[in-house]
Every structure is written in structure tokens, then in C-alpha cells.
Amino acid sequence: MKKTLALMLSLTLGAGLLSGCVSTRPTTATGDVEGSSSPTQESSASGGVVNVYNWGEYIDESVLEDFTAQTGIKVNYQMYDSNETMYSKLAGGGAEYAVIIPSDYMIARLIEEDMLEPLNFDNIPNFSDVDPELKNPEYDPENLYSVPYMWGLMGVIYNTTAVDETDLGSWDLLWNEKYADDILMIDNSRDAIGIALKSLGYSYNTTDEAQITEAVDLLIQQKPLVQAYVMDEIFGKLEGGNAYVGTYYYGDYLTMLENNPDLGFYIPEEGTNIYVDAMCIPKGAANKENAEAFINFMCSTEAGLKNCEEIWYSTPLLSVREALDPEVSSDPYAYPTADILAKCESYAGLPQNILDLYDSEWTRLKSAT
């Protein structure tokens, strides 16, 4: 991590922890984010090709060049803005990707629907550096299909010059009429409905249809206060002071903080989502060995450290964490303490009838006036 950011963390994190998990220091969205090239099955002259489909703002692109230089394998890289966008592309058969990086709950769904290839870990020896705490997870119990890429927490980001300290601490800030038209809400169904569920005291993973409907009713009440529903658009709006309150991922908050030191972050008292994004290979993907070579490379200490220091997310690699600046590796939001973890809940896979309900309720929210 850049030294300037590490210094800002050391100056501000302590004050945030004193105020109860307050630090002042990717969902159905619009579609693909433009990437470097379209998927292809053509081979380069040197070592073939690997088509990678990842979230926006979620890689140090120089590591792609490093991978090609080391292996001779060309990377065709495209981005998406939500798990649901990625799923729709795969389910529609519209593209041939060799590596995808979905979140935990989406991995569970892809496994259940037989949409992933089992990995050959003989080709991924660097898997040994993955933190044992992140191996054999609930979403992939035997680690047959996935290798952790990054992980982290979701929380509330706010402008410290515009938001009163007495209003902090809860998800309720996103419903505070004082900040009408300065609130940004995340633009995907699982996260937005999940936030409303948590604010009501329910589980992210409830299958109680009445609770889900109640959560969407709460989002409809919030809608007049919302300036915009956003994904990566949140960067420009919060960095530029064009909105004062939003919810996003801690790694992205650290990126925003470099550009606007007036931003703060906290974990709501009701609890939040802890997630893992992992590298997988879609069923029937071309160039599977190239895909496994890419996954193995991303788990190397050199590539992992370079990537982590660029995008700020929490690394699953033990050697990388050891190499980070101590101010970063001891950051309790990047590498949560037990009291913070006690407030966290992972997303689980949901049955199809509940997924259908999410879709219809999300449409109800978006069409509400």
C-alpha cells in the first residue's frame, strides 16, 4: 500500500475505533464495464490466451502484463459491475471466459447449477499460501471450484465535513432526511435488500418472504432521499463531494480516501456483510490450463502484493499480508478484529423461489414513484 495511505490510516483509524467502529480516515446493474478487449479463443504466437472477467476497479492491470511476460499467455480482460451481470452473461452463453471472480454466494449458485469446472490444484501450487481460515468455505466446502482472490467488509462511507458525528453508527444514516439528495444507494438487489434486512434486525439470508417484502418497503420509503443508485459511480461522487453518504466496500473506501481525505467509514452497529471473491473457471471454458496458470500467478507473493497495494482489498495470501506495511496489516477493518467479525454475516446461496422474489421486489422498488 502506498505510504501516504498508510500514514492517513495511522492518523485517523484510532479516532474511529474510539467512536464505536467509526473510522474517519462488486447485484443487478447496468451491464458490462468496458474492458481492454472482447473474449476470444484465438491463440497468441507465444503461449495462447486466457479470457478473464472481473469486477471493475479490481486489479492492478500491470500484473496482467507481468503474467504475459512470464508465461507468454495473452490476457483478454473484461469487467462487470455486479455478480448478477456476470451470471446473466454466463447463463446466456454469450461469451467464452476462462477465469471469473464472483462473490461467495454467487459461487454457491454456480456450483449448484453445475456451471463451474473443478480445478486441478496440481497446476495451482501457490494455493498453499492461502490463509487456512479461507479454505473449505461454506460456499465451496471442499475447495473444488474456487481460489480466494480478495475479501472484505461492506460499510457506510460519509463526508466528515458534512455529516454530523451524532448521526453515525447505524444503517439509519441512509434513511436520514437531513441528507436528502446526498445519499447514494448501492445498485444491486442482494446488497440493497440485505442492508434493509439488517437495519430491520433480520438475517441477510432470510427466506421469510414477509421479511424480504418489508425490507423492500423500507427501501421504497428511502427512495425520495436517494440522489442515485450507483455501483462504481460512487467513486467520483464521493471523491468530488457531490454526495455525502453512501455504502460500499472497505477496499474501495481506501481508494476514495486517497483522493478525498475528508471521507470516513464505519461498520453499522446492526452488522454488515463479510464477503470473499474467488477465482473460478466456468464450465466448458477453453484453455483451462492457461486459466489455472493465471490463478496460480495471482496467488504468487509478487503479483499478490502488487495487486493488494493497488486496490486496497484484504489479501487471502499469508505471505502478502506479512509483506504489507504494518499500519495496513493491523488495520482492523482490512483484517478484522474479533469484535468486528462478531457483527459480520456472509451471504449464503438462496433457493430459486427467493431469488425470483428478489427479482420481482427489486423491480417493484425501481418502478416505485
Q: Whereabouts are the PLM-identified features?
A:
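Early extracytoplasmic/lumenal segment of secretory-pathway proteins
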Residues: 22, 31-35, 42-109, 236
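Periplasmic-binding protein-like
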Residues: 213-221, 259-283
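Short, hydrophobic alpha-helical packing/hinge segments within bilobed ligand-binding/sensory domains
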Residues: 86-87, 107, 171, 234-237, ...
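A ligand-binding cleft/hinge motif common to bilobed small-molecule-binding domains
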Residues: 106-109, 245-262
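Mature extracytoplasmic/periplasmic domains
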Residues: 282-342
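Short, low-complexity disordered leader/linker segments with a strong preference
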Residues: 1-49, 368-369
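Conserved C-terminal helix/tail region of periplasmic/extracytoplasmic solute-binding proteins
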Residues: 338-369
